[in-house]
């Protein structure tokens, strides 16, 4: 049913999944750092991340992606020229991970900031009273408590990142979008392969929903739900 393009499309789907997972890891790390910075008493650092989140959320993803990709390429070429080295192109996968991670790190920043503020202060005070260090308090008390509040936002951000990987095909990445486009052009069946591409993304998001539901159950153990 895939006119001999099954292997190409499967490889593209794996590339898409690798890109999404790598990007979300980078975005989570940036988000945790950004949330800590915005909540810190260091005013200049908080202002830097405030500007970062405002900029990212106010400019379309595609525009940011092109700006970051070409900006990195220009900066890299400037360095190689200054060192007398030959120019080389940034790998599309690396470029995609950096751009998506940087863009969605802003959204994770707000997700984790809100989750931190939702944790009762008594949790931290109790950890301090028991002699926990700052790192122990974060790992054993704060992070597990935050996850319950952050999971809905994390799930939403993951779904958006997963779908945003389709934009990285514009940077030359041979992902599932590029693979299905190639198959559509080669077989004169663009609409059919667009449906195939959409179904692959639907499978990814459906499986993701199941995993997120399991995580939500894990982190809400002992929490009573109110029936409205």
Labelled PLM ranges:
Residues 1-228:
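Transmembrane alpha-helices and adjacent helix-loop boundaries
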């Amino acid at each position: 049913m895939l006119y001999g393009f099954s292997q190409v499309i499967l490889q593209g789907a794996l590339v898409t999944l690798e890109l999404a997972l790598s990007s979300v890891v980078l975005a989570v790390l940036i988000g945790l750092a950004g949330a800590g910075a915005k909540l810190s008493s260091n005013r200049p650092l908080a202002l830097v991340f405030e500007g970062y989140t405002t900029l990212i959320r106010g400019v379309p993803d595609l525009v940011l992606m092109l700006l970051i990709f070409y900006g990195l390429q220009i900066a890299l070429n400037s360095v190689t020229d200054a060192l007398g080295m030959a120019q080389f192109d940034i790998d599309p996968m690396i470029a995609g991970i950096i751009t998506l991670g940087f863009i969605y790190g802003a959204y994770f920043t707000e997700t984790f900031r809100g989750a931190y503020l939702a944790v009762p202060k008594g949790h931290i005070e109790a950890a301090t009273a028991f002699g926990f260090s700052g790192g122990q308090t974060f790992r054993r008390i704060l992070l597990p408590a935050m996850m319950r509040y952050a999971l809905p936002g994390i799930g939403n951000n993951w779904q958006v990142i997963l779908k945003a990987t389709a934009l990285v095909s514009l940077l030359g990445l041979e992902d599932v979008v590029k693979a299905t486009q190639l198959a559509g052009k080669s077989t004169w069946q663009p609409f059919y392969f667009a449906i195939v591409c959409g179904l692959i993304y639907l499978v990814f998001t459906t499986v993701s929903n199941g995993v997120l539901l399991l995580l939500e159950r894990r982190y809400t153990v002992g929490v009573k739900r109110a029936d409205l």
